[in-house]
């Protein structure tokens, strides 16, 4: 490798590392008269700083246009792939949004309860079947199915859902897990979603643990100093 190529390679590595470090740092968003601190879980980085049309399109596909996207995070490995122009794995990712119609108003506990009821209506009850693959195989392809209620407090509700993709001729069905958390934070209603491909029970444990830890971390980040 020539000296010039070594310098270019070194600079590229430093740039990638700097970008990932910056994206992984906590940041604040202004919602009406409140500043909300946000941060992605460990091992993930926000991508909104990239202003990438490709990533913006991907994030917008996850939520209705009536929501404002505050954070869209990829794994650190995927962010490095994106920086290098390589294909993304997209095995795990997450998003935080807030309803545009509520972002400037202070949300009371009553209004937040109504927001929960409207957002989670029709989910049904969690199944008795604990085998995720067995249960999803019995459900319609592509439908989101409630798997469990993870948390239910006055200021935070979390649910776990799963879906199955249709198998192709040469491939078996794929399974996807997602958690949705509705969180009242500093008088603002936030919706947090985490997505992971399901290959084995460790993915189920990962999304449960990450959902709980992320909510607790955000509440701690926004607690009065």
Q: Where are the regions a protein language model picked out?
A:
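Boundary at the C-terminal end of the N-terminal hydrophobic targeting segment
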Residues: 22-26
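N-terminal secretory signal peptides that target proteins for export/translocation
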Residues: 1-6
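Conserved polar/disulfide-associated segments of primarily extracytoplasmic proteins
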Residues: 54-175
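Proline-anchored loop/turn motifs at beta-strand termini and strand-loop-strand connectors
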Residues: 34-52
